[in-house]
């Protein structure tokens, strides 16, 4: 029984560390948000999308509170040409309102924009 629990625990750990699916996007479509909702935050070095999500969640919790965790799973997008990440919350089908959004420069970790849809 312990062996089975160990194996099950191993799968849980492996599953939690799986890189989230990253979709493409064009940061040019988000210039309005960069202009209207700039941020002074900086996430520092970003090693991968898991690291990005951990750092983004800290920023979102500071800005919007713990309730932001209800917007999991977070969606990850990357503009390869410009080296920009976009992370968005997920709105459950039984909920109304908007989601948190953040644009981050991969090279510098600088948060370009931070906003919440309504």
Regions found by a protein language model. Name each.
Residues 67-117:
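Exposed beta-strand-loop-beta-strand "reactive/processing" segments of non-cytosolic proteins
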Residues 29, 33-73:
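Short, non-transmembrane alpha-helical segments in secretory-pathway proteins
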Residues 15-25:
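Ser/Thr/Pro/Gly-rich low-complexity linker/stalk segments immediately outside membranes or between
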